[in-house]
């Protein structure tokens, strides 16, 4: 496949995608690097990727073939092209993440789980975020929760209009499809030494970057 980012440009590099998880990741990195470098054209040769239905001996399950990879690269390119000339928004990045997750899920085995959160103070994006799953065709690969804190509840008690509007929209969404949830970042910090914490996909536990999601101690408790 050929991916073009930005205005028309001469033919660019060719990347022959290896038949491995690392190869798929590298293909995505080459696409996003191209966007960061100002755009251009790149061709992805997927002839080495094993066909759909092949057994995956190491991980288990069956291969999804090159189709989901091509679709993911095309969808990410569409998102990046839509951002030319402006900063990325949280919803743009969620679209990229969703495209990646959809490619990972393909193959008949549950291989991807996501949680997306956005701070309640982000007035520019929070209401679009809250309603982003109202269309079942979008963002079905992620759970979504609004990140609140002690200030949020104090603002509610003080009658703050933005905090009240956020809570009302959250409640409306919950009544329709159960989302978004609320994650209390102030409570998540109790007893923790790091301020850079994010919830796991089901929000049972808060983790630092690259920390393994082990729920054994929660289950034992």
Predicted feature descriptions by range:
Residues 1-72, 173-221:
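Function-dense linear segments that define catalytic or interfacial modules
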Residues 67, 71-83, 91, 95, ...:
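Conserved, charged catalytic cores of large soluble enzymes
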């Amino acid at each position: 496949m050929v991916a073009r980012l930005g205005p028309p440009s001469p033919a660019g590099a060719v990347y022959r995608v290896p038949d491995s998880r690392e190869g798929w990741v590298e293909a995505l990195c080459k696409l996003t690097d191209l966007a960061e470098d100002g755009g251009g054209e790149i061709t992805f040769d997927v002839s080495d990727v094993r066909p759909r239905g092949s057994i995956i001996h190491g991980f288990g399950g069956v291969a999804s073939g090159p189709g989901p990879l091509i679709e993911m690269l095309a969808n990410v390119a569409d998102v990046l092209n839509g951002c030319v000339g402006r900063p990325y928004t949280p919803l743009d990045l969620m679209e990229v993440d969703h495209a990646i997750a959809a490619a990972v899920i393909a193959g008949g085995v549950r291989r991807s789980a996501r949680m997306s959160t956005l701070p309640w103070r982000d007035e520019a994006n929070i209401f679009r975020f809250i309603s982003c799953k109202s269309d079942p065709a979008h963002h079905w690969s992620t759970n979504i929760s609004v990140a609140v804190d002690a200030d949020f509840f104090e603002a509610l008690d003080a009658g703050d209009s933005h905090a009240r509007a956020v809570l009302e929209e959250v409640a409306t969404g919950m009544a329709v499809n159960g989302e978004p949830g609320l994650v209390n970042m102030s409570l998540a910090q109790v007893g923790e030494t790091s301020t850079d914490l994010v919830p796991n996909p089901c929000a049972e536990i808060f983790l630092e970057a690259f920390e393994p999601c082990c729920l054994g101690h929660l289950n034992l408790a």
